[in-house]
Amino acid sequence: MAVTLKDIANQAGVSLATVSRVLNNDPRLSVSVETRRKIISIAEQLSYTKRPKSQVTGRRIAIVQWYSAERELDDIYYMSVRMNVEQAAQQAGFMTMTVFENNMDQIPQDIDGIVAIGKFSGHQLHLFEKLTPAVVVVDYDVLVGGLDCVLPDFVGGMNQAAGYLTTHYQNIGLIAGLELTTDGQRVRDVREKTFLNALKDCERYNPKLVKVENYTVDGGYKAMKELLAGPESLDAVMVTNDAMAVGALRALHEAHVVIPDQIALVSFNDIESV
């Protein structure tokens, strides 16, 4: 028997409308990160799939997430990207299969296309190309390797944020994320590099106000706790990922810091629930 939205709503303890809007990524919906995670987790556990609105073409696309299903629950950004890619592909009439980091060997040999989300090693990308010439990478610049890719304007966004913060604040911190490719190589985040260069250009760079942790809620929490415990004055903090910003906010609230009166906080990704 097919899983319905009502089944998910009953298990999550929320309304049918909330489930529908979360699973359809309604940008107008205001819901906590915890509720969103719970709904999506239940949908995954029940193997819920949306009915495509367009006529199915018979072609199959593998949506490959560089995280495991468990780790994805800690990063609402990559979860949102993956769900939106699935939705767009299904609406275009494609059949989709979701593949996580720990089961990439399940991608069939006759797959028609692959959308790879995240930071994959060159070796892994080569394996994808051996399966199909139709490979698109999301959120990782691999143009130099001859692959198509889609990613946000990290440089423009970070320069805009840096321009605002350096105009209004003196002591500016940065919480950046540690990312590794699927073979363990560190990826230097262009957001981190761009923001630090902007601070250096206007002589606001203070290495003691830069913290690098895992791109998770806990990572953001730990980094902000370290900044608050340090001897340096702090007026504003740039966080390069919304999941980390959730943790940073928790640390500020625990320290009874008034935002933005005492410390301003800016984060990147624009997840509506942050």
Go through each PLM region and give its residues.
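Short beta-strand segments enriched in small/hydrophobic residues
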Residues: 20, 55-72, 171-181
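Bacterial carbohydrate/catabolite-sensing allosteric modules
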Residues: 45, 49-50, 87-91, 130-134, ...
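Short, glycine/serine-rich, charged loops/turns that create anion-binding
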Residues: 23, 27, 68, 103, ...
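Alpha-helical recognition/docking segments in bacterial nutrient-uptake
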Residues: 59-163, 227-229, 243
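N-terminal helix-turn-helix DNA-binding module of bacterial transcription factors
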Residues: 1-57
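A generic structural signal for short coil/turn motifs at secondary-structure boundaries
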Residues: 26-30, 70-74, 147, 181-185
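Amphipathic alpha-helical segments in well-structured domains
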Residues: 36, 82, 188-192
